[in-house]
Amino acid sequence: VNEVCAIYPITPSSTMAELADEWASKGIKNIWGNVPEIIEMQSEGGAAGTVHGSLQAGALTTTFTASQGLMLMLPNMYKIAGELTSAVFHVAARSLAAQALSIFGDHQDVMAARTTGFAMLSSASVQEAHDMALIAQATTLRARIPFIHFFDGFRTSHEVNKINLLSDDQIRAMIDDELVIAHRNRS
């Protein structure tokens, strides 16, 4: 769905950014018939700033992050939410590396973002992560409230499982063209 993916790979969300980059380099098109632009930044803060700028230009834009990366995105998240800009940040949730330097899955990172104004949508399996990513995208366009779509880092982000992929036609049916046009017109 998205036209721009601003990335700075951080474990356990690296796989999402790497796959987006791989698909773009292979010329795989989104539902609009375009190859999404993948912009790899020097930091998570840079990725969030790129998301903000791209959204302000009217592009459908996303990013993928986890733990400390999400913390560095918070200042831009306040701006994005305050401007009622549609966006989805996909977060492979894990503990923040503090005194214990833990990489175990928990929701410390996501809970630290509660006050940004982003809505939160959680997925508990690979299938749910696939399905809820689209629901978050469709809902952010309708509500003009940005979303954090999160799931357990490592347990879900690295799980290998068979899922039922949504077809481009199904995805297209979920995205309202008028809402996309309205998003673009606000730029």
Where are these regions (language model features)?
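Conformationally flexible catalytic loops at phosphate/diphosphate-handling active centers
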Residues: W32, P36, F147-S187
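Thiamine diphosphate
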Residues: V1-A112, G117, L134, G153-F154
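Conserved thiamine diphosphate
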Residues: I103-G153, L165, D177-V180
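Intrinsic-disorder/low-complexity, polar/charged segments
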Residues: W32, S43, S125-V126, S187
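Arginine residue identity/basic-tract feature
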Residues: K79, R94, R114, R142-R144, ...
